[in-house]
Curated annotation (Swiss-Prot):
HAMAP family: Ribosomal_bS16. Pfam families: Ribosomal_S16. It comes from Methylorubrum populi (strain ATCC BAA-705 / NCIMB 13946 / BJ001) (Methylobacterium populi). One of its GO terms (cellular component) is cytoplasm. The keyword DNA repair does not apply. Transmembrane segments: none annotated. Keywords: Ribonucleoprotein, Ribosomal protein. This is Small ribosomal subunit protein bS16. Residues 95-110 have a biased composition (Basic and acidic residues). Residues 81-120 are annotated as: Disordered. The keyword Ion transport does not apply. GO terms for biological process: translation.
Amino acid sequence: MSLKIRLTRGGAKKRPYYRIVVADARAPRDGRFIDKVGAYDPMKAKDDPARIVLDNEKIQSWLAKGAQPTDRVLRFLDAAGLAKRPARNNPQKAEPGEKSKERAAKRAEKAAAPAEDAAA
């Protein structure tokens, strides 16, 4: 049984409220869960301490038992200092694409050609 620490959605239409729960990975998003370990209210201000409420002891015990947090919950745990989120590094993402490299090369050739003509 693979355990996940994840969000379950509650609240009304257009007014989301999430519970942070420990659940079997195969269970539906809003279905059966094992333990409630916190809450997240995205409608509150970002600096409001009640926006994210975590039960630190329960979370640490479930992490020790092997529960895996989802990406969003891992962000919350990292901000609270309960878990470390690995830094993502993708150096290729910053590189320009092939077509833009070709365009830049053509521009450089065109700029170099008039300079050579003026020098000659």
